[in-house]
Amino acid sequence: MLTSTTDIVQGRTIARYHGIVTAEVVYGTNALRDFFAGIRDLIGGRTGSYEQIFEKGHREAIAELTERAQKLGANGVIGVAVNTGTINIDDRGALLLITATGTAVTVD
């Protein structure tokens, strides 16, 4: 399945627009990982565990996005954007939210 952050595909014709597709991935935070991430932040290091979570989340969100586009009969998704955020659930933690959006299309 073709995926692109642009709204055109060079050398290809968009034969049909199927509509907007979205996908969401949500991860719970881990208190121990948060503790060590906080220490790394204080000393200026990178928080590799969170980087890995976001990388995994991006991959999973794109995979879900293309799966939903296929269900609409599309063979591509254009204008793909991935955003991240947090949802505070209480004073003990938060949820990490990764969303992907795009337009499902059929390209020739």
UniProtKB/Swiss-Prot annotation:
It comes from the Bacteria. InterPro entries: UPF0145_dom_sf, UPF0145_YbjQ-like. Coiled coil: none annotated. HAMAP family: UPF0145 (MF_00338). Belongs to the UPF0145 family. This is UPF0145 protein sll118. It comes from Synechocystis sp. (strain ATCC 27184 / PCC 6803 / Kazusa). The lineage of its organism: Bacteria, Bacillati, Cyanobacteriota, Cyanophyceae, Synechococcales.
